[in-house]
Amino acid sequence: MVKVKFLGHAAFYIEGSKKILIDPFLTGNPQAVAKPEDFKDVDLILVTHAHGDHIGDAGEIAKISGAKIVAMYDIANYIAEKFKGVETVGMNYGPTEVDGVFIVQVPAWHSSSDGKYSIGNASGFIVKLDGKTIYHAGDTYVFKDMELFSELYGPIDVALLPIGGHFTMGVKEAAKAVELLKPRTVVPMHYNTWPPISADPEEFKKLVGDKAKVVVLKPGEELEL
């Protein structure tokens, strides 16, 4: 069994034969229900891009857990320089295997910086763990090539999609992404953290209709696959 827990904003904890964090923005996250020290035994940390609300506490958690950080090559180097001794795996789109976990880094339409300097490119991740396939879109707008993700690596058991608009897809665009991705289940994320990304997940659910099962998770709640 694989469990996918929503930690608020775009942060998720995936637990199966390996324990994986994605975009662990906990400190300073008004939605957060966990702290960095709660993840002392995590195996991998995936970072979609360098913005502070996604890179978050990745370095700190890697320090206390010994987890490997998987990120765009430039971002991996940035983290390794900032947090000496942390092990990173730098990618630049494409598939790889890290400690028995199949990971595909896929494009995302978004910027990536530390607030001052551009660092690498934004991405999403497809993770295959214990027979289940999880897609975390990162921050992105909808794009036609999303249909390749399910064609190449599907079926996708759960897609974690931003719906807040302003910086990413809104509910209408995210519903279109569901058509392209054809996931069995979709979990909305990256909304209602701050006023600029206010969105109604129930509106998203209506737009998706019967194309996929929409599960709206509150921070701290989890989905079993």
Curated annotation (Swiss-Prot):
Pfam families per UniProt: Lactamase_B_3 (PF13483)
InterPro entries documented for this protein: Metallo-B-lactamas (IPR001279), RibonucZ/Hydroxyglut_hydro (IPR036866), UPF0173 (IPR022877), UPF0173_UPF0282_UlaG_hydrolase (IPR050114)
GO molecular function: hydrolase activity
Superkingdom of source: Archaea
Keyword match Hydrolase: yes
Record's keyword terms, sorted: Hydrolase
Record family assignment: Belongs to the UPF0173 family.
NCBIfam families: PRK00685.1
Official protein name in the record: UPF0173 metal-dependent hydrolase PYRAB05000
Source lineage: Archaea, Methanobacteriati, Methanobacteriota, Thermococci, Thermococcales
